[in-house]
């Protein structure tokens, strides 16, 4: 192995980073990149004036070498024994592994390294890297440290554009298979913009993409005082000014940055007030020292004599840093363990010996106690409640933790997880409003009414930390990462133009190839889009950015104001819609999955609805799921979201026909680069030139054929109202709430039909009926926490129309209620008995009413809410008094009126049934015939003649001889004269034998024969004897 001089710019970059306390990024291309990690680490060790920097080594599955030290020694001895040991080749890496503190970590376990700090981070297996992992691992590197990304050998960096990433398998669905790697292209292009980034090969040659470092110069050496920035000097002055103010001075001495010191001062200000009506909300990005500031504040609260302090967090394991700084604060305040306080650790192995309680007994008994976020009822005696990582706790639980005591809360925003948006969007916004209301000056008229409210009103203080603890401000790697993953787009631009009419705005299709091409103009537009996303949604993850860029089924639309023809700049974005095309799954795939109880990735609505209704045909329909609608914060609630949705629906219904003969076609795949085209050391990477326009009018692109539009969102009254107004119908409501927001996921659908088709389609009506039936049954279980108004809003849906239900019959009524039940109802309707006597019948009455089986029974909104609350949610009148906001006496009056109406309807059903049973005289209705009288007579004559002919024919064919009457006229005259005029029977002599005689003769002869045979048999027997 021959020696080679390493490019001096690599050493200068590392040394400058150490001097400025800023990180450096190296991308090493080549299979032997691991060997160059040793050289880079060696350079870093020489540049720093402290212990050997620790290393975080992240990988997917196979490390490529053994991390086990004993195993490595055995392998070394084996090589010595075989005589294959090459000291020059093997030694450097062996020595590096043996002498360096390396933390090996699988990518799927990187959440465990949060809060740790390393001097160097190595990321191998590029195909497993996701934006989340990149942000999570890079964030752990301290100032002056190195981030090293290892790539396999390739002849051109453009080959990375077509690398299949592991996450791409999740983006593919049965109908959409072709993934385009736009994110990788943008990642490679962004490396050129990072001043602290070097792309090198595995021989440490600098590649042309890093040409910006051609003129890199080493920084002149600085004294410790010269290296301090203005904020460091201000922090030093603050610490000196507070030396005489105790216990604040010693606590501020523990702070690392000016921001952190100011946050601790704000906390101590809240503690020293002792009004117990303040909320201090601390928000910051990762690595800004939030937990440390909270820990120091708790130590300050103990010093100020607070007795009951409660700390909550998603898990006690997350509070290591907080309690570490509580004890550092105690040390600064000269508290001694065992003498002044004792520490109690958890015995639960899951919590990793986390601190759960601290008992302080220096002056009087004081406790710092961990409680679970769900145990808000235990806060009765609390004086201070500290909520760490509040964004990771469900919003309803955080609200329940607020009470008549001092509250400190800290939350991460702008981090890779993007969790803090739920806190800042919803909770802090509500606290701001409450705080503003309490500050309103009370006039003479409202003084009495607001006294009680002001007594319970809370004051909100907001603190944010900008400066990082680990590295110096202005870190180039942080800026590169924020730009690449659109993390730092919280500061949304205010729109200076007026509000255009929603009807005048137009929807445009955004071409993703152009959006992610890393051109300056498209980058500005992308940052604007992501700023809207962050400002209008509670959870945004960098992984969403990769899905938006690479997933083949996702499409992006934006609503823009009318643009004057002379305008050259990009217009302001009013709203963004992200749509995911779903469905077109084969029936066989669905049947296989339903039978095994498994669902494929993607296609959220088809799989969920198919599973819920056990319908294998629904997945075959093609649909579009609205993933996000993000409206500019200045323009929310003005109708722009509804306008964007309306235009999107019209587009997919085919109302914007594409009239151009030559449709603008976007390439479905990026052209691969042949290996002979250009060498790695000569290649120049620039954004593509031959790109289509960024924005297309809807009539410039043909729409996909869709059967329905759908949406899945966290149910809130405001969102439900928005989607119902847009014509959507609920078909699914998840029974368990979301872990982060505490909201139930709701799926709503709308069929895309022509204008003349008013009905919503047979399958949607069937789904809606089934959903309503099941929802009514579940209202007393999982959905009993819903307010009656929200539940009523879900049940009542004008978009489906009121189905024609058959009126309630007497048989159905008798199946539900006995005659005695109806008697009880009637007694209550006359105010003769108490309402408790009929409570057992209210669930049945409620159910048949909300299933539209009570015909035209009309109830007001308040009556419907009351019936639903008592009958289906099984709530007490006291609970409903708060929720419906009416006094209980008024509620009982409404309830009595409901029962009166029901009794009246039941009586009508019974009366109608009795009326039908009674025989009513029917009037004969005479109607004139169409035929004339002569035609009618002719027809009757013909019928008679034909009938007569048939009868005559029958008589002719019959033998009637036995009916002939004998005797001539003389004999008849003689007999008649003898009988006289009054005789009723006469007899005439006939020559025919009588029937009886004729019948007896053969019988007698038969008897004689039988006797003769019997006599003969007897004679034979006698002879034999």
Curated annotation (Swiss-Prot):
The keyword Metal-binding does not apply. GO terms for molecular function: 18S rRNA cytidine N-acetyltransferase activity; ATP binding; DNA polymerase binding; mRNA N-acetyltransferase activity; N-acetyltransferase activity; RNA binding; tRNA binding; tRNA N4-acetyltransferase activity. Its main location: nucleus. Induction: Transcriptionally activated by genotoxic agents; possible role in DNA damage and induction of cellular resistance to genotoxic agents. Keywords: Acetylation, Acyltransferase, ATP-binding, Nucleotide-binding, Nucleus, Phosphoprotein, rRNA processing, Transferase, tRNA processing. Residues 990-1025 are annotated as: Disordered. Acetylation at Lys-426 is required to activation of rRNA transcription. May be autoacetylated; however ability to autoacetylate in vivo requires additional evidences. Acetyl-CoA binds at residues 629-631, 636-642, 725. ATP binds at residues 287-296, 470. Residues 702-1025 are annotated as: Required for localization to the nucleolus and midbody. GO terms for biological process: negative regulation of telomere maintenance via telomerase; positive regulation of translation; protein acetylation; regulation of centrosome duplication; regulation of translation; ribosomal small subunit biogenesis; rRNA acetylation involved in maturation of SSU-rRNA; rRNA modification. Pfam families: GNAT_acetyltr_2, NAT10_TcmA_helicase, TmcA_N, tRNA_bind_2. It is found in: Nucleus, Nucleolus; Midbody. CDD domains: NAT_SF (cd04301). It catalyses: a cytidine in 18S rRNA + acetyl-CoA + ATP + H2O = an N(4)-acetylcytidine in 18S rRNA + ADP + phosphate + CoA + H(+); a cytidine in tRNA + acetyl-CoA + ATP + H2O = an N(4)-acetylcytidine in tRNA + ADP + phosphate + CoA + H(+); a cytidine in mRNA + acetyl-CoA + ATP + H2O = an N(4)-acetylcytidine in mRNA + ADP + phosphate + CoA + H(+). Its EC number is 2.3.1.-. PROSITE patterns: GNAT. PANTHER family: N-ACETYLTRANSFERASE 10, RNA CYTIDINE ACETYLTRANSFERASE. HAMAP family: RNA_acetyltr_Nat10. RNA cytidine acetyltransferase that catalyzes the formation of N(4)-acetylcytidine (ac4C) modification on mRNAs, 18S rRNA and tRNAs. Catalyzes ac4C modification of a broad range of mRNAs, enhancing mRNA stability and translation. mRNA ac4C modification is frequently present within wobble cytidine sites and promotes translation efficiency. Mediates the formation of ac4C at position 1842 in 18S rRNA. May also catalyze the formation of ac4C at position 1337 in 18S rRNA. Required for early nucleolar cleavages of precursor rRNA at sites A0, A1 and A2 during 18S rRNA synthesis. Belongs to the RNA cytidine acetyltransferase family. NAT10 subfamily. This is RNA cytidine acetyltransferase. It comes from Homo sapiens.
């Amino acid at each position: 192995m021959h020696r080679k001089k390493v490019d001096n710019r690599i050493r200068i970059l590392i040394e400058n980073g150490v001097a400025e306390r800023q990180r450096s990024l190296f991308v090493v291309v080549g299979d032997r990149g691991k060997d160059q990690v040793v050289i880079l680490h060696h350079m870093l060790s020489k540049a720093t004036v402290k212990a050997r920097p620790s290393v975080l080594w992240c990988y997917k599955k196979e490390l490529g070498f053994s991390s086990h030290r004993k195993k490595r020694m055995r392998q070394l001895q084996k090589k010595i024994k075989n005589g294959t040991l090459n000291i020059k080749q093997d030694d450097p890496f062996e020595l590096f592994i043996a002498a360096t503190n390396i933390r090996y970590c699988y990518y799927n376990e990187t959440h465990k390294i949060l809060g740790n700090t390393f001097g160097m981070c190595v990321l191998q297996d590029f195909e497993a890297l996701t934006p989340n992992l990149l942000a999570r691992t890079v964030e752990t590197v301290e100032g002056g440290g190195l981030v090293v990304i290892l790539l396999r050998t390739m002849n051109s960096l453009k080959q990375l554009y077509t690398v299949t990433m592991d996450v791409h398998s999740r983006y593919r669905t049965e109908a959409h298979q072709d993934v385009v790697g736009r994110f990788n292209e943008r990642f490679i292009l962004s490396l050129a913009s990072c001043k602290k980034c070097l792309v090198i090969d595995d021989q440490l040659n600098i590649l042309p993409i890093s040409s910006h470092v051609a003129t890199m110069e080493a920084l002149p050496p600085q004294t410790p005082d010269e290296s301090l920035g203005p904020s460091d000097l201000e922090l030093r002055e603050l610490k000196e000014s507070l030396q005489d103010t105790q216990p604040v001075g010693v606590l501020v001495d523990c702070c690392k940055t000016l921001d952190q010191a100011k946050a601790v001062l704000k906390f101590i200000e809240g503690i020293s007030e002792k009004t117990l009506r303040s909320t201090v909300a601390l928000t910051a990005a990762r690595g800004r020292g939030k937990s440390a500031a909270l820990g120091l504040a708790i130590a300050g609260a103990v010093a100020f004599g607070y007795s009951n302090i409660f700390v909550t967090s998603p898990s006690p394991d997350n509070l290591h840093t907080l309690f570490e700084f509580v004890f550092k604060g105690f040390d600064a305040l000269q508290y001694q363990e065992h003498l002044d306080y004792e520490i109690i650790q958890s015995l639960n192995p899951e919590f990793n010996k986390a601190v759960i309680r601290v008992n302080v007994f220096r002056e009087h008994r004081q406790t710092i106690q961990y409680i679970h976020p769900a145990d808000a009822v235990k806060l009765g005696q609390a004086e201070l409640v500290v909520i760490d990582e509040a964004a990771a706790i469900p919003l309803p639980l955080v609200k329940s933790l607020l009470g008549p005591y001092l509250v400190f809360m800290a939350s991460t925003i702008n981090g890779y997880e993007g969790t803090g948006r739920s806190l800042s969007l919803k909770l802090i916004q509500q606290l701001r409003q409450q705080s503003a209301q309490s500050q309103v000056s009370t006039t003479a008229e409202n003084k009495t009414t607001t006294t009680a409210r002001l007594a319970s009103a809370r004051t909100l203080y907001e603190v944010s930390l900008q400066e990082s603890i680990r590295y110096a401000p202005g870190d180039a790697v942080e800026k590169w990462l924020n730009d690449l993953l659109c993390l730092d787009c919280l500061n949304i631009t205010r729109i200076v133009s007026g509000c255009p009419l929603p009807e005048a705005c137009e929807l445009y299709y955004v071409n993703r190839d152009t959006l992610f091409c890393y051109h300056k103009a498209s980058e500005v537009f992308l940052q604007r889009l992501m700023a809207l996303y962050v400002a209008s949604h509670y959870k945004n993850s960098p992984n969403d950015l990769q899905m938006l860029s690479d997933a083949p089924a996702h499409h992006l639309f934006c609503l823009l104001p009318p643009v004057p023809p002379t305008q050259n700049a990009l217009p302001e974005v009013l709203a963004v819609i992200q749509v995911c095309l779903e469905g077109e799954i084969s029936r066989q795939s669905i049947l296989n999955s339903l039978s095994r109880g498994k669902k494929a990735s993607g296609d959220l609505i088809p799989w969920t609805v198919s599973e819920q209704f056990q319908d294998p045909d629904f997945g075959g329909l093609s649909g579009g799921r609205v993933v996000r609608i993000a409206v500019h914060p200045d323009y929310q609630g003005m109708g722009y979201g509804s306008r964007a949705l309306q235009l999107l629906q019209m587009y997919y219904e085919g109302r914007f026909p594409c009239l151009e003969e030559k449709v603008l076609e976007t390439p479905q795949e990026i052209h691969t680069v042949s290996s002979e085209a250009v060498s790695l050391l000569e290649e120049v990477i620039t954004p593509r030139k031959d790109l289509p326009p960024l924005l297309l009018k809807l009539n410039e692109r043909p729409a996909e054929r869709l059967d329905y539009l759908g949406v899945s969102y966290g149910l809130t009254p405001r969102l439900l109202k928005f989607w119902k107004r847009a014509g959507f119908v609920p078909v699914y409501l998840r029974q368990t709430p979301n872990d982060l927001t505490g909201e139930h996921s709701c799926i709503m659908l709308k069929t895309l039909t022509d204008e003349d088709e008013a009905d919503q389609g047979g399958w949607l009506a069937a789904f809606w009926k089934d959903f309503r039936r099941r929802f009514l049954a579940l209202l007393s279980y999982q959905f009993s926490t819903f307010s009656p108004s929200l539940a009523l809003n879900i049940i009542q849906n004008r978009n489906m129309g009121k189905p024609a239900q058959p009126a309630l019959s007497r048989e159905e009524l008798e199946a539900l209620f006995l005659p005695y039940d109806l008697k009880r109802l009637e007694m209550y309707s006359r105010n003769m008995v108490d309402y408790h006597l009929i409570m057992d019948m209210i669930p049945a009455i409620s159910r048949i009413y909300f299933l539209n089986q009570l015909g035209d029974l009309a109830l007001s909104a308040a009556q419907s809410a009351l019936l639903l609350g008592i009958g289906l949610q099984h709530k007490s009148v006291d609970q409903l008094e708060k929720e419906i906001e009416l006094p209980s006496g008024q509620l009982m009056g409404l309830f009595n009126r409901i029962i009166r109406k029901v009794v009246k309807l039941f009586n009508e059903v019974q009366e109608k049934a009795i009326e039908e049973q009674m025989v009513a005289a029917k009037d004969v209705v005479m109607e004139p015939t169409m035929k004339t009288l002569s035609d009618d007579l002719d027809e009757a004559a013909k019928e008679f003649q034909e009938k007569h002919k048939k009868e005559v024919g029958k008589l002719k064919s019959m033998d009637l001889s036995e009916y002939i009457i004998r005797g001539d006229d003389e004999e008849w005259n003689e007999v008649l004269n003898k009988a006289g005029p009054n005789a009723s029977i006469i007899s005439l002599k006939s020559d025919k034998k009588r029937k009886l005689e004729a019948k007896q003769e053969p019988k007698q002869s038969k008897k004689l024969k039988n006797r003769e045979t019997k006599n003969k048999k007897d004679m034979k027997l006698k002879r034999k004897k």
